Amino acid sequence: MIRLTGVTYSYPDAEQQALRDVNLAVDAGEILGIVGASGAGKTTLAKIITGFIPHVDGGNLAGSVTVDGSDVAGMRLADSVAKVGLVLQNPFNQISGAKYTVRDEIAFGLENVGVPREEMLRRVLDVARLLGITDLLDRSPYDLSGGQQQLVAIASMVVLRTPVLVMDEPTSQLDPLGTRMVFHVLEALRAAGTTVVVFEHKVELLAEHCDRVAVVAEHTLAAVGLPGEVFVDDRLDGWGIGATRFTRAAREAVRRGLLPVRSALPVTVEDAMATFGRGRGVRS
C-alpha cells in the first residue's frame, strides 16, 4: 500500500538533510507505529507520506513515494488527501472556524466530496459515538479542551475512511481512556482494510496495538520489525528511546514469553466494525 524507496529530503535553504535514504513498505490493513526522539525526522516523514511535502513545504525530495501504486509527489494535493488522511499533532490546526459546530467539523470533508446528507449525518454520529463525543456535537470546537479538540480532529479524518490514515502524535492531549479508545478504533479500521501509520511516543501503545514498529533516528529509519523485536533492541538507548520503565519491562516480558493484557473498553471491536464494515472509501 505504501512504498518509500531511497527517500531523501531537505527543507528549503536547509544545510542538513531532514531525512536520508529511507526505505519502507507498509501493507494494506497494517498498523505501523513509528517512534523516535524529538527532531529525528518523524513529522517530516508523515508529511512526505501524505504529500504535504513537497506540495506545501517545498524543498528537495529525492526517491520514490507511492500509495496504492500512485506517485504521491506527482499527484495534486487534493488527490493525495483523498487517499491519505492526516491527523495533526496540534488539533487546533484542523479546526475550520468559530462559526462551526463539532458536527460541522466532522462532516466538512464528507460534504466536500458530495456524500449525501443522510449518509453524512449517520457517519458523523457513528464516529462520534465510537470516540465518545456525541455530547459535543452541537458545541463549538473553540469551547472544548485540548483533549476534546484532539478527538474531534481524529473523528474528522476517521469518518472519511481513506485507504490510508497517518496520525502524528494523536494522543498527546488525551487521558488514558481517550487514548485507548482511539487505538481501539484504529484496530477496527485495520480489520476493515485501512492502512494506519501512527507516530507516537508512548511505546507501550505501539507494542500493544501495532503489527510492526519503526524507529526514526538520526534522520533515517534505524529499525523496522515486530514490537517484540524492536523494543528489546539494546540500541534503543542510543536512539533516544530506551531507558524507560516500559522498555525495560518489555525486554523482560519478551524474554519470559509474556504477552500484553488489554483492558476492557466501552467500545468493542465488533461494535466498531459494524460502523467501518459498511463499505470502503469516502463515498461508501
Q: Where are the predicted features?
A:
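H-loop/switch region of ABC-family ATPase nucleotide-binding domains
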Residues: 200-201
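Conserved beta-strand-loop-alpha-helix hinge in the C-terminal portion
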Residues: 220-246
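Conserved ABC ATPase "signature" region
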Residues: 111, 118-136
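ABC ATPase NBD Q-loop/coupling interface
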Residues: 64-79
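Conserved ABC ATPase signature
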Residues: 140-144, 148
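The feature captures the beta-strand-to-loop junction immediately N-terminal to the Walker
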Residues: 35-37
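Catalytic Walker B motif of ABC-type/P-loop ATPase nucleotide-binding domains
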Residues: 165-168
